[in-house]
A protein has these predicted regions:
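Carbohydrate-active catalytic/glycan-binding domains of CAZyme proteins
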Residues: 1-220
């Protein structure tokens, strides 16, 4: 039963953004790379893949998996020079849950990595805390190489106030760098913790004072 529900990343091409053709990867399922072997941290599957074009012949796929050994989600990295043949970087996750008592001690997921400069990578990710089961927030980690990360001390965007459309949590971040060193953050908002049914899409903008502090954009 486990094999039938395992998720793996695929690849598709399009010339117009509307009509797509699947690329058949080397794995027997057609996936471009596989989950980890039994006992590996990502043995349960590959979820939420996001591609970063980091440089010439430097294409990176950041992904999440629930670590079979801990039951907590972590972030991994696969590398490719041509977009077709992939290899995982190392045998462990590159970014895992925070220490006990932190805002992300129950798991990290849905990574979205953006390169802002030669030596500056930022990763937006979905964070879970053991103190609020199922309620996700969005946090931002920083790195000089896109592999070793500095964890923030607090989330950049938290669940909405009681009664808000996103009171159940915010996640699935997608960041777009804007002019003036600001960042536009699209995210999934949930009405109930851990329940994506009826989820919607929200947008927040970084503030002038701090590009890692975000304010929701509300309808006029």
């Amino acid at each position: 039963a486990a094999a039938t529900t395992t998720t793996r990343p695929g690849l598709a091409f399009s010339q117009d953004g509307r009509n797509w053709a699947r690329f058949e990867g080397e794995h027997h399922t057609g996936a471009v790379f596989d989950r980890g072997e039994d006992g590996a941290w990502d043995a349960r599957g590959v979820r939420d893949p996001k591609v970063l074009l980091a440089g010439p012949r430097d294409i990176r796929v950041y992904y999440a998996s629930i670590d079979a050994r801990t039951g907590k989600s972590a972030v991994g990295l696969a590398l490719t020079a041509d977009g077709f043949a992939y290899s995982k970087r190392g045998s462990e996750a590159i970014f895992g849950p925070g220490p006990s008592g932190s805002f992300d001690d129950a798991g990290v997921a849905a990574p979205c990595v953006v390169r802002l400069g030669r030596d500056e990578f930022i990763m937006f990710y979905e964070a879970y805390s053991s103190s609020a089961p199922g309620v996700a927030s969005v946090a931002v980690a920083t790195s000089r190489d896109g592999v070793s990360w500095t964890r923030p001390s607090a989330p950049a965007l938290e669940a909405g106030a009681a009664g808000a459309w996103d009171q159940g949590g915010v996640g699935k971040p997608y960041a777009v760098p804007m002019a003036g060193d600001r960042i536009r953050l699209y995210y999934e908002g949930r009405a109930a913790a851990g329940d994506e049914r009826g989820a919607g899409v929200g947008v927040a903008l970084s503030t002038d004072a701090d590009r890692f502090v975000f304010a929701r954009r509300t309808s006029d």
